Each structure stands twice: as C-alpha cells, then as structure tokens.
Amino acid sequence: MDTPTLLAHLQTHDTPLTLPRGGTLRWDDADLHRAAHAAGPEHYALLALAPGALPWQRARVLLQTLAASQAGLDDATRDTLARLARVLTLALPPAHVITVLLALRRLRANHKHTTRTVLRFVLEHPDADALIAARRPALLDCFEHALGKTAARGCARRIDDGDTASDYLRRRLLRFLAVPAAAPARVQALYAAPPAATTGGLTGTGTAAGTGTAPGTATGPVRALPDEPALTLDPAREQPPTVTATNRGDIAATLVHLYRGGPAEDLYAALGRYVDDAARAYPRFAGTVALVLDASASMRGYGEREWAVLSQAAALRMLLSRVCDRLEVVEVGGDERAPRGATDLATGVLDALAAGPDLVAVVSDGYENRFPGDLARVAATLPRAGVTTPVVFCHALFTAADDLTLRRPAPSLPQRGFWHQDDFTTLLPWMFAHCPAGRPWLRAALHDRLDVLDRQAADLTTALAA
C-alpha cells in the first residue's frame, strides 16, 4: 500500500476495535493493516506517530505490531518496534490499550516482545495502581496471558510468601521489566481479593478463598478508569473564538503586519526567528520541490480577511525554503507583495515540471478564473504523456470550515487544506509522502519524534523507580 493512502486512513478511519464477550475481535480494516505491516514493519509502525493519526488507528498499529512475529528482523528494527510499542501504550487512552491486550489474548499472540509490552503496561504504567483498581479482572487476564497461567500464579504465590528477587522471579517475570521493584506490590494487587470479599487468602485461581467470587470478578464498588494518556502525542490545539488575519500562527501574523506597512526592520528580524523555530522541527528534504504559488488577486482578500490567505501560503513557502535542499517557486498572477490578475494554475504546473522536481505542490485558494478546468485537464493528461512526477494541491484556507464546493479546480489531484501554521505538522508529511524522495524524510522525521517521545517515556519510568 502506498504511504499517502495509509496515512489518510490512519487520520480519518475512526471505527473502534471491539471485543464482544465470547465473540471474535471486530477489526474492520485488519487486512489493510496486515498488508501494510507485511510491506515494511518499521515503516508501518512509525506511521502511527504521524501527527493527526487517530487513537483507534494507533491502537490497531499497536495490535498488529505486537501480534506479528519478529522472526527475520534485525536488531535495530526490533529495538525501534519495542520503543514504539512502549510509547503507544503510554500515549493511548488506557481503555484502548486494554482492548488491544485483551485482543492479543483472544488471538493467542504471545511472543517475547508481546510479553514485555504487556507486563510493562500492567505493572509499570504511571497509573498502574488506578488501572488495577478499576480493571483488575481484565488486567489479570492480560498478565496471565503474557506469562502463562501457571508461571503467573507461581510468581504470585512466591511474592505473596515474601519473595521479591529469587531466580524463579527473575527468569519468569522481572527480566521483562524496567523497574522490577514496582512489580511485587502490583502483582499482589492483581491477585488480591475483591473489596467485598475479605476472608481467605490467595488461591491458585486468583480468587479469594472461601468466597463464591469467580476468577477476575470484582464485587466491590466500581472504580473510574483513568481516561487520559500518560504521554501526549499530539498537543491539543487551541482554536481562537474568532479567526482573524493575525491569529493564524506567528509567521503569517508577522507577514500580515509587513504587508500592511509595519516597521520593517523589527518585523523582518522577528520573521526570521519564527521561520527558524518552525524549520527546526523538521529534517532536511534531500530533493527538489516545485511550488506553484497562487499570487492572483483573490489570494489577497479584502476587509478583515485581507492578506490572511496569502500570508499563510507565503509562510509555507518560507518554511519549505528552509527544509528543502532545493525549492523552485513558480508564481501565478502577480507576486507575494503585489498579488494581482487571474489564476492560471495549469501553466504554472507545466512550468514547474520543467524544473525536473521530485514533487510539484500547488498552493492556491482554489479559484481558477482563467480558463477554468485547465488544471483538471492537465492533471488528467500528464500520466498519459508519461509524466510520473507527483502533483499535490494544497488548499490555502481562511478557516477549517471554508466551503470548497466551487474551489476544487482539479478533483483528481490529492488535496489537503491548511489555514494555520500548526497545520504544517500534518501538511509536510502528507506532501512528501507522495514522492519517493520523501520516504527517507518521513522516516527521519518519525524517528526523531520517536526519540523525543521515548525520552519522555523513560522519564516516566525513572519517576516510577524513584
């Protein structure tokens, strides 16, 4: 499966995984995930970290990664998958992760990497005590599936007898953990009698002796399951109550002030800092991007919206100039400082292709008012003419709610909208995913993100040890 299609699926398909009692796992896109994993386990798994991927899709990636064998994978790939699984178990809502772990039990998937991930979630999650209190039966099932019922109960008996570091515990349990000292108390909590059953001790079934409680069934008060992830993958975006030309990101806001005649020296200095800060978040793209930049009169806008759309398009151009080894800009109509005239996007695309780029990106508000339909005809003709260079359409919007009914000049082209500087975090991976030169960039960007998240996960583990 091609990367853009998989990315779009991860960012739009929001159907939950469900596990009916006594039924089979309901996973409506399992074939798609299995095919993507088979094509490249590391690339597939890293895409779960792509900005904008949905929680239930990330849960599916976690499930597929843990369910699949790692036979034949090199050590570096195994390490990447292990770190990613650890990050996802902390960055997903706990209920999602518990569903994944129970699904692994239902699928009878139990590899060493699966065991390690399950045990570290059950015993080392920062909210493990609250999770066990709320979902003890489910987590007990996960624990016994990971170790095997006999080994799990053998460990529990030894811990109940005061053993914390015997060879038996090290070989069967503690070697899988990063903070072994936290395990005994939580194993005891897993096998503790339900709150309403206070007599008797631990039995071989994980129930309280002398009670009629079934294994894994709580009869005490229901505890609330923590619903917030311990690790944040995508920071929540604060939407302004009213969108204006100057609250759509620092780069665009500074450009608007410049276009309106503000103090140039101070504004240019600030602009450079803002672009540098934004570019620092991305690796270099070792290829050529040809940017068809719509600088027609409609991009300027009017009234309170004046310069809003063009400034955001210019912000994208400035960011790409810092990220790409080579950026060719083809302006259509006028130029950034003096937008004018009509929109001839088709000619702009043909001129851009003449530069021999790896990718052509059209940035426009979508109003094609010179030879309407030309861009669609050119887009349809290029493959027949043997042109294989990917062309994508980046919709410059005023807000995310813009009506694009009359603003799709080439419906066959891949399209994505952007209105705020924060949208660049999803726009750039989407753009570069369409060309072969973008695959190494995407891998580097996602590896960088994994490194940052893995350090944050390690900090959580360190806090647990303290």
Describe the residue ranges of each PLM region.
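…and closely analogous acidic/polar surface helices at protein-protein or active-site interfaces
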Residues: 286-287, 299-327, 331
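Long lumenal/extracellular ectodomains of secretory and single-pass membrane proteins
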Residues: 1-206, 210-290, 295-302, 330-466
